[in-house]
From Swiss-Prot:
There is a cross-link at residue 140 (Glycyl lysine isopeptide (Gly-Lys) (interchain with K-? in acceptor protein)). GO terms for biological process: autophagosome assembly; autophagosome maturation; autophagy of mitochondrion; glycophagy; innate immune response; piecemeal microautophagy of the nucleus. Residues 25-42 have a biased composition (Low complexity). Keywords: Acetylation, Autophagy, Cytoplasm, Immunity, Innate immunity, Isopeptide bond, Membrane, Ubl conjugation pathway. Shares weak sequence similarity with ubiquitin family, but contains an 'ubiquitin superfold' and the C-terminal Gly is required for isopeptide linkage. This is Ubiquitin-like protein ATG12. One of its GO terms (molecular function) is Atg8-family ligase activity. The keyword Metal-binding does not apply.
Amino acid sequence: MAEEPQTVLQLPPSSAAGGEGLTDVSPETTTPEPPSSAAVSPGTEEPAGDTKKKIDILLKAVGDTPIMKTKKWAVERTRTIQGPIDFIKKFLKLVASEQLFIYVNQSFAPSPDQEVGTLYECFGSDGKLVLHYCKSQAWG
């Protein structure tokens, strides 16, 4: 089975006002390698092991929520879950009044201030963190 293209999710600095500045870096194909040495972005050298700076997240739609064509993204390990939530809302062009629910491994909703790196260490598998997103409450 062919590997899915991966895109680096560039989130603005935490101090940026208005949440603007999200950019989408062109996708690159990944090769089947051990998770600790998987490439994240062009020209980026990562330390071996669990100390890599970016975490691969796999975004899966639930229910009637629109499916994103690019499902695999790379996010800095120090980012909070609120960053990907804001990005998904903007990417799906959701109105400010619409809610977006994020679930880790179809089981629980992490708090918006939870760091992606911590979630990956506890619940990541196969070198990525699986996040399910939906517009209505699905689990827990």
